[in-house]
Amino acid sequence: MLVACQMAFAQSTRNVGDFSSLKVYNKINVTLIGSNESKVETEENDPDIETVNKNGELKIKLSPAKILSGDQVSVKVFYEKLNDIQASQGSSISSSEELDANMLSLTSNEGSKVNLNLDVSKLNIKTNSGGEIKISGTADNQDVVVNSGGKYFGKEVKSQNTKVTANAGGVAEVNVSE
C-alpha cells in the first residue's frame, strides 16, 4: 500500500503600494525580486509581520510578541524601483538578480547583512555596529563609510571612482579602476 502526503504551506501576499525605500528589522530575512508590481509575500498569513508603507518608504518588522518568540521569518519583496535599502537589528537582505538603479544607498546596522549584485551609477554605502554589506557588479562611483565594526566587501564591484572612510574598526575592501 502506498500512501502519499502533501503538505501545503499557505503563502500570503500583501499589496503594499509603490515604494522606492526599504527598511527591514528584527532578524527578518528578505529576498528581493524585481517585478512590475510592488508586493510582499510571506510564508504564512502572519499578522505579527508588519508591513507599513509611508510616503514610499516600506518598513518590514515584527510585532513585539513575535520578536520574543525567536522564530525565523522570511519574506519576498517584489519591487519596481529601489534607491534606498536599510537592514537593521540582525536582518538580512539578498537577491539572486541584478539590481539596476541610477543611484542606490545601502545601509547595514546592528549585525545585519546585505548581499546584492548591482548595476548602478552612484552607490552610497554605510555600515556600522557589526553590519555587513557584500556587493558584486558595477558602480561608476562609490562613497563608502564603515564605522564601529562595520564591514564592506566590495572587491567584486567594478568601480571607476571610490571614496572610503573607515573609523573605529570598520573594514572596507574595494576595487577601483581609476
What is the meaning of each model-derived region?
Residues 1-178:
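Intrinsically disordered, low-complexity terminal regions
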